[in-house]
């Protein structure tokens, strides 16, 4: 009874149990619902470490609550408790047991570190292993498929069930490339080339984030990783590598002129490899979001073109506040027509 | 040589004081002001994150707030608050009349203070630094970082000098000024941990000073140490920073351990369990603290060999830390525990710190850290260490030493209320952040989109912050209330404590001990209570006591350094009103001029005559002290 009374004072702590109730967050963002072998490995070892650490914590908490319950000084009790110096046997025990626990964690730590650093091609697909060069910019992502000869901006496509190798670069400041549901993150560092690999078990859209402070709009530096079955992926690659055709619609055709006259094209390539100044637009019409985070509708698109700074503080795109309504309409129609998949 | 101090105005007295007890109180006040400032910033940041896509702070302002919050909390709040206790308590606990170099002690305070002021001035010159408290290049380089970073670089450079010379002072004091019989293995644990922490400052603040100097050269004079396009190396900064930055955590947490190791025995009425093991565990923690800096950099691409080595090295720190945890628990075990406010904070520290520690081991698993790194999981981890460890023990120390420092108690009812509100708020704020991190929330983000599963926990976290703020307000009310209505303390030893500071009368006379005490054991006061008459045996007859004179020079020298730093910052301003070099060189000239004056001016201090000391003693006897 007494014990319970004491314990109940610590009731706030019992929301520890929240941890076990499965509030997992959004599918395809959270790392608590892994969707690839690397993420699964991380998840399993995280659980292993939580179990070990929970054991340690439970021992400490148990001793602590016993103390709370048993060793309170009663009013008027002036007795001086026995003054103990220490206890060598006990002290050796709580030195040796943690060492054993740490060894249990150290072994997967080392094997995992080497496994993740492996940048050899996928043995299953050999020469067809997908290599993607990632470049972090303030505040967007560029994906160069160098072997295939084209560039994608903001959305990166990979085939399902294959180890995909990423080569990481940074254009300006540090960024960090992270797709939580698929695995860990590695920084993109100016002047240094890093590598990592990821694999997706199933098709889907996985959210990616920049994890290293990179300026005022760091929070908005999101991207999408889209995993497709191999044949769909091949179709996408083909579409991205194809010559860009004239838009068939007149409005869109007009829009293309606007795009060229306002030198949008100076920063945003359509087809082929992009310049480094802005995201490539080859498949813009298929994007779910603008600028990494805004829903891709006409209203947002117009707002973005007229004043990108107010939507993403500190980015380098110039504003076009005075573009006429007709031009804007045509431009949007043109951007909508940029698709590579049927 | 004068025999009597002249009367001075109160302000002049504080500006010129070299008394360690007054300097301690100045550290306490300055540290508290900075703590509140950084706390308000935290509150604002949490309000911004209460709902998705809030528009309370802009991305730029938010980044300035994280930078200033982190920098201020570590350098200008936690450090000076610990220094406050170290300054007050160390000389008393070792039976000394003052620190080894009272003048340097005052200098250390004023340099720290003006350095902090310089940093804070950034708000008036176009915004605070915005590259995080770690100031990673290139974001903090000339090309990407604004003027605020110059304030960061020079403000920290100046205040770091203050911290460094104070640490040297503590080292010399502890080595040289101990009372007869106070051997190293009888030092109270707070003195031990302060000693080791000061050693860490010596070895960690020097690389920081070097790093800041290099960054300053890059920013002001277009050197290229950290600019990759010019052959510099970005990662170099991270190594230099963390060689300082990792030990910095131990610099703060070791004295916090020391406070806990004082408060728990006092209120359990037991000696510290495993004293020797505690001392050596502290040393091992400090040593390992220097070996593991690169665990902050698992994701920069150091390669698997380096990552494995640093991962395993990091894990080993858990062993000595575990020893400490169990020794604290077994100090309480079998004791007769009084749960007043100080003890509530000290005892609740133990399980809370364990929660922060176990996530530390989790983070040390490098490949799993690829997930945790730079997410809210890390934010949760280090706030469990910093708030759950350092801040809880600061509060424990405050309630414990307050009667000695200010001559009255803090109100216990308000104190306990404060404890519960703050403690609940703390867990509410930071526990859910572990989950936010795993659910994909990076740290240092000023906003997040709705419907990503992050909304609920962010909301809970912000509510927790309101509780913590309410707690701190309760503390402020307590301090004000107790100043007027609090129970006066004139007895030497209101807690029935064990160490030497409680052998001095309250209020503590300027000379601390009328006669240097003879120390016969660990926990000397307790020993005398059991084996003697409960008072310390004097180790010397009553004689004239030699005291140092106050001096305004430390204050002026610090102003000199302030202007030296400000002048250099002006080099990067668009339209400085006067030539920056005049300000910079003028400031340095002021400082060096003062040093020259100090060197040639003869100042032998003054004596308190033996008769007066005797009179004081007689007065105390009458008061039944
Ligand atoms: C009153 C309770 C506190 C609250 C609510 C709080 C809140 C926050 C928040 C919201 C952040 C930004 C997190 C991010 O990186 O996205 C932060 C960062 C930080 N806090 Fe606290 N904090 C508190 C107390 C402290 C204390 C007492 C210290 C140190 C003594 C501290 C040290 C830091 C540091 C070093 C950072 C990292 C700053 C950076 O990223 O550059 N905090 N805190
Ligand atoms: Cu970024």
UniProtKB/Swiss-Prot annotation, chain A:
Q: Which UniProt keywords apply?
A: Cell membrane, Copper, Electron transport, Heme, Iron, Lipoprotein, Membrane, Metal-binding, Palmitate, Respiratory chain, Signal, Translocase, Transmembrane, Transmembrane helix, Transport
Q: Which parts of the sequence lie on the Extracellular side of the lipid bilayer?
A: 23-50, 109-342
EC numbers on record: 7.1.1.9
| Annotated localization | Cell membrane
**Might you report a single GO cellular component term?**
plasma membrane
Please list the residue ranges that the record places on the Cytoplasmic side of the membrane: 70-89
| Lipoprotein listed as a keyword | yes
Q: How does it sit in the membrane?
A: Multi-pass membrane protein
- Residues binding Cu cation are 175, 210, 214, 218
According to its UniProt record, which reaction does this protein catalyse?
4 Fe(II)-[cytochrome c] + O2 + 8 H(+)(in) = 4 Fe(III)-[cytochrome c] + 2 H2O + 4 H(+)(out)
- GO BP terms in the entry: ATP synthesis coupled electron transport
Q: Which residues cross the membrane?
A: 51-69, 90-108
Give the cofactor note text. Answer: Binds a copper A center.
- Residues with covalent lipid (N-palmitoyl cysteine) sit at 23
Q: Which residues bind heme c?
A: 264, 267-268, 317
Segments forming domain Cytochrome c: 250-342
The signal sequence is: 1-22
Q: Which cofactor does it need?
A: Cu cation; heme c
Annotated segments matching region Cytochrome c oxidase subunit II? 23-249
Lipid tethering residues (S-diacylglycerol cysteine): 23
Task: State if Plastid is listed as a keyword.
Answer: no
Family label: Belongs to the cytochrome c oxidase subunit 2 family.
The record's function comment reads:
Subunits I and II form the functional core of the enzyme complex. Electrons originating in cytochrome c are transferred via heme a and Cu(A) to the binuclear center formed by heme a3 and Cu(B).
Q: What is this protein called?
A: Cytochrome c oxidase subunit 2
Recall the taxonomic lineage recorded for the source organism: Bacteria, Bacillati, Bacillota, Bacilli, Bacillales
Swiss-Prot record, chain B:
Q: Where is Cu cation annotated to bind?
A: 246, 250, 295-296
Pfam name, any one: COX1
Which residues are listed for heme a3 binding in this entry? 381
Catalytically driven reaction(s): 4 Fe(II)-[cytochrome c] + O2 + 8 H(+)(in) = 4 Fe(III)-[cytochrome c] + 2 H2O + 4 H(+)(out)
Q: Which InterPro entries match?
A: Cyt_c_oxase-like_su1_dom, Cyt_c_oxase-like_su1_sf, Cyt_C_Oxase_1, Cyt_c_Oxase_su1_BS, Cyt_c_oxidase_su1_bac
State any GO CC term: plasma membrane
**What induces or represses its expression, per the UniProt entry?**
Elevated expression at high pH.
Its name, as the record gives it, is Cytochrome c oxidase subunit 1
Supply the source organism for this entry: Alkalihalophilus pseudofirmus (strain ATCC BAA-2126 / JCM 17055 / OF4) (Bacillus pseudofirmus)
Give the gene name. ctaD
């Amino acid at each position: 009874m007494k014990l319970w009374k004491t314990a109940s004072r610590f009731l706030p702590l019992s929301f520890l149990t929240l941890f076990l109730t499965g509030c997992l967050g959004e599918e395809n963002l959270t790392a608590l619902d892994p969707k690839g072998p690397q993420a699964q490995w991380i998840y399993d070892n995280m659980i292993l470490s939580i179990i070990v650490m929970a054991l340690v914590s439970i021992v400490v908490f148990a001793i602590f609550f016993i103390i709370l319950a048993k060793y309170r000084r009663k009013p008027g009790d002036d007795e001086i408790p026995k003054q103990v110096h220490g206890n060598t046997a006990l002290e050796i025990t709580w030195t040796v047991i943690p060492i054993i626990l740490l060894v249990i964690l150290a072994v997967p730590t080392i094997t995992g570190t080497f496994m993740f650093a492996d940048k050899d091609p996928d043995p299953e697909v050999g020469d067809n292993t997908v290599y993607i060069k990632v470049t972090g910019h303030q505040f967007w992502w560029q994906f160069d498929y160098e072997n295939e000869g084209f560039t994608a901006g903001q959305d990166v496509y990979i085939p399902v069930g294959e180890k995909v190798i990423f080569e990481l670069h940074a254009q300006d400041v540090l960024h960090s490339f992270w797709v939580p549901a698929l695995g860990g993150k590695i920084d993109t560092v100016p002047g240094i080339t890093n590598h990592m690999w990821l694999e997706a078990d199933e098709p889907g859209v996985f959210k990616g984030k920049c994890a290293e402070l990179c300026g005022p709009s760091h929070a908005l530096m999101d991207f999408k990783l889209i995993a497709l079955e191999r044949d769909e992926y091949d179709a996408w690659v083909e579409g991205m590598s194809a010559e860009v055709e004239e838009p068939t619609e007149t409005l869109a055709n007009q829009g293309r002129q606007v795009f060229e006259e306002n030198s949008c094209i100076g920063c945003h390539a359509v087809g082929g490899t992009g310049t480094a100044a802005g995201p490539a637009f080859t498949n813009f019409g298929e994007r779910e979001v603008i600028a990494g985070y805004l829903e891709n509708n006409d209203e947002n698109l117009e707002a973005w073109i007229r004043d990108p700074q107010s939507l993403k503080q500190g980015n380098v795109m110039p504003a076009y506040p005075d573009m006429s309504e007709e031009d804007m309409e045509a431009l949007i129609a043109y951007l909508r027509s940029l698709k590579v998949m049927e | 040589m004068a025999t009597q101090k002249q009367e001075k105005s109160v302000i002049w007295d504080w500006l010129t004081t070299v008394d360690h007890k007054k300097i301690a109180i100045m550290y306490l006040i300055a540290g508290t002001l900075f703590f509140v400032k950084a706390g308000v910033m935290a509150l604002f940041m949490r309000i911004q994150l209460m709902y998705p896509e809030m528009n309370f702070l802009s991305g730029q302002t938010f980044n300035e707030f994280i930078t200033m919050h982190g920098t201020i909390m570590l350098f200008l709040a936690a450090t000076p608050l610990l220094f406050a206790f170290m300054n007050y308590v160390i000389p008393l606990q070792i039976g000394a009349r003052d620190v080894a170099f009272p003048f340097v002690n005052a200098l250390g305070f004023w340099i720290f203070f003006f350095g902090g002021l310089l940093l804070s001035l950034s708000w008036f010159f176009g915004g605070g630094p915005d590259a995080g408290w770690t100031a990673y290049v290139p974001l903090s380089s000339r090309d990407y970082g604004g003027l605020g970073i110059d304030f960061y670089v020079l403000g920290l450079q100046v205040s770091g000098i203050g911290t460094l010379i104070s640490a040297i002072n503590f080292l010399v004091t502890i080595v040289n000024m101990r009372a007869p019989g106070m051997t190293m293995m009888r030092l109270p644990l707070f003195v031990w941990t302060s000693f080791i922490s000061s050693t860490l400052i010596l070895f960690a603040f020097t690389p920081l000073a070097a790093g800041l100097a290099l960054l300053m050269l890059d920013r002001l004079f277009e050197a290229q140490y950290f600019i990759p396009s010019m052959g510099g190396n970005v990662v170099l900064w991270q190594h230099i920073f963390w060689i300082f930055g990792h030990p910095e955590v131990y610099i703060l947490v070791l004295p916090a351990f020391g406070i806990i190791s004082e408060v728990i025995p006092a209120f359990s009425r037991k000696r510290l369990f495993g004293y020797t093991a505690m001392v050596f565990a502290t040393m091992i923690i400090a040593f390992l603290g220097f070996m593991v800096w690169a665990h902050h950099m698992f994701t920069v691409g150091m390669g698997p060999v380096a990552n494995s080595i640093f991962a395993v090295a990091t894990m080993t720190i858990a062993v000595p830390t575990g020893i400490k945890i169990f020794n604290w628990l077994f100090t309480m075990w079998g004791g007769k525990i009084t749960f007043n406010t100080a003890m509530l904070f000290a005892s609740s520290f133990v399980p809370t710190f364990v929660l922060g520690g176990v996530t530390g081991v989790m983070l040390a698993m490098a490949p799993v850290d690829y997930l945790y790194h730079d997410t809210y999981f890390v934010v949760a981890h280090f706030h469990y260490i910093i708030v759950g460890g350092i801040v809880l023990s600061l509060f424990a120390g405050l309630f414990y030493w307050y009667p000695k420092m200010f001559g009255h108690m803090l109100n216990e009812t308000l104190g306990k209320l404060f404890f519960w509100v703050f403690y609940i708020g703390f867990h509410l704020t930071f526990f859910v952040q572990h989950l936010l991190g795993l659910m994909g929330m990076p740290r240092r983000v000023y906003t997040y989109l709705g419907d990503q599963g992050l909304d609920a926990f962010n909301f809970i976290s912000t509510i927790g912050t309101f509780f913590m703020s309410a707690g701190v307000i309760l503390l402020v009310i307590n301090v004000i209330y107790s100043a007027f209505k609090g129970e006066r303390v004139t007895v030497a030893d209101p807690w029935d404590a064990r160490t030497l500071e409680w052998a001095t009368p309250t209020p503590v006379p300027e000379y601390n001990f009328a006669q240097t005490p003879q120390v016969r054991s660990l926990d000397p006061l307790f020993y005398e209570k059991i084996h003697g008459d409960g008072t310390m045996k004097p180790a010397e007859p009553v004689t004239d006591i030699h005291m140092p004179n106050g001096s305004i020079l430390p204050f002026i020298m610090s102003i000199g350094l302030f202007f030296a730093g400000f002048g250099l910052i002006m080099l990067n301003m668009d339209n400085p009103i006067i030539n920056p070099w005049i300000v910079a060189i003028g400031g340095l000239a002021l400082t060096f001029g003062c040093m020259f004056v100090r060197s040639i001016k003869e100042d032998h201090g003054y004596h308190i005559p033996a008769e007066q000391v005797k009179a004081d003693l007689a007065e105390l006897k009458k008061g039944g002290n």
